[in-house]
């Protein structure tokens, strides 16, 4: 079978591998659509394991079922989560599934940029979701990234009327925009240095878009009646953006850190100011089964219309081109690889 083999961000090759064989409780998924995630381009992290097949935003059709699989059959349209929890550890039992060691070590094989994917029994049991005909394979690739966004906003308990500043208008920032709108947030303002991203944010309904090179704090106060933001969501990994978040949050407000930085980056927090002003800093990583299920329901109900975010549709044979487009980030939001 054909796979997209990652060597580095500028070298992703179409190669041949043996089609995986499945065992009891497993399924073989024929990939129909697979999204390129921004984390796929975190070269400092990925290159340590290269060469490898990436891709974790996957939907497809079941090609084979292993012995003992009862809830799924050949031909079913499904989304499959790459990370699934044990549901028995102290983290899972307190609702913190994304801290589970099992979740951090599970995966499917070889990765989403392949014609066929072996889904282990644990992922079949806890991470496989049937797609109704009303949800396309393309929309199915958004379940995982939307679930991550949903978990983040659930963690900070976003409320009606809250002002929100989203730092970074790439795919995660725009998903935060769409979800915050559906959750009843008040003014939503967004920043970026990419004019294409800013224009997309404006088209999708952001109250204001601000070039990150300009006076973000001044522009924020001008739009938000002199106030800073109740919730600041960091969706860009530059250390300058995190420092901007410290300046942009209103008293008793919250900063949601949704993006990693390069290794070794540190953040200097004015502790006394944050203590006096009761500022909360919260991080959010990944998604759990509940988040995936809720994301699917939002897509089924068309409450979050993700099709507007797809800028490029490419075949598996164009995987290298897809990574190039994402890395350059000139006029792209979401690149979908199709079989």
Whereabouts are the PLM-identified features?
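Local beta-strand N-terminus motif with an aromatic residue
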Residues: 75, 161, 206, 228-229, ...
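Short Gly/Pro-enriched turn/cap motifs at secondary-structure boundaries
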Residues: 7, 18-19, 49-55, 105-111, ...
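Glycine-rich beta-strand-centered segment in the early N-terminal region that forms part
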Residues: 20-34, 45-90, 132-134
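C-terminal hydrophobic helical "lid"/dimerization subdomain
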Residues: 3, 243-247, 289-339
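NAD(P)H dinucleotide-binding glycine-rich loop of Rossmann-like/cofactor-binding domains
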Residues: 86-167
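Glycine-rich cofactor phosphate-binding loops and adjacent beta1-alpha1 units
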Residues: 156, 199, 204-280
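Mid-domain Rossmann-like dinucleotide-binding core that forms the NAD(H)/NADP(H) cofactor-binding site
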Residues: 135-214
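Residue-level marker of beta-strand positions
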Residues: 57-59, 77, 91, 116, ...
């Amino acid at each position: 079978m054909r796979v997209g083999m990652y060597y580095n961000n500028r070298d992703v090759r179409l190669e041949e591998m043996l089609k995986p064989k499945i065992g009891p409780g497993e399924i073989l998924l024929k990939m129909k659509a697979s999204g390129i995630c921004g984390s796929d381009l975190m070269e400092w992290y990925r290159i340590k394991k290269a060469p490898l097949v990436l891709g974790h935003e996957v939907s497809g059709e079941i090609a084979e079922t292993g012995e003992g699989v009862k809830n799924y059959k050949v031909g079913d349209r499904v989304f499959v989560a790459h990370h699934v929890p044990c549901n028995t550890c102290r983290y899972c039992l307190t609702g913190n599934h994304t801290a589970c060691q099992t979740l951090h070590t599970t995966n499917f094989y070889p990765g989403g940029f392949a014609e066929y994917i072996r889904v282990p029994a644990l992922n079949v049991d806890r991470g496989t979701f049937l797609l109704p005909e009303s949800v396309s394979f393309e929309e199915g690739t958004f379940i995982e990234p939307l679930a991550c966004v949903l978990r983040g906003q659930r963690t900070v308990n976003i409320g009606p009327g809250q002002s929100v500043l989203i730092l970074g208008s790439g795919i995660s920032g725009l998903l935060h925009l769409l979800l915050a709108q559906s959750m009843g947030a008040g003014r939503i303002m967004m920043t970026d240095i990419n004019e294409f991203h800013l224009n997309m944010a404006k088209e999708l309904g952001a109250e204001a878009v601000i070039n990150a090179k300009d006076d973000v704090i001044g522009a924020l106060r001008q739009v938000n009646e002199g106030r800073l933001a109740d919730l600041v969501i960091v969706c860009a990994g530059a250390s300058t953006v995190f420092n901007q978040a410290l300046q942009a949050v209103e008293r008793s407000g919250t900063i949601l850190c949704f993006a990693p930085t390069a290794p070794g980056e540190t953040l200097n927090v004015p502790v006394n100011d944050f203590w006096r002003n009761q500022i909360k800093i919260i991080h959010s990583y990944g998604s759990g089964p509940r988040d995936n299920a809720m994301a699917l329901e939002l897509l089924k109900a068309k409450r979050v219309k993700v099709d507007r975010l797809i800028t490029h549709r490419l075949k598996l044979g164009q995987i290298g081109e897809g990574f190039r487009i994402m890395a350059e980030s000139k006029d792209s939001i979401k690149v979908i690889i199709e079989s």
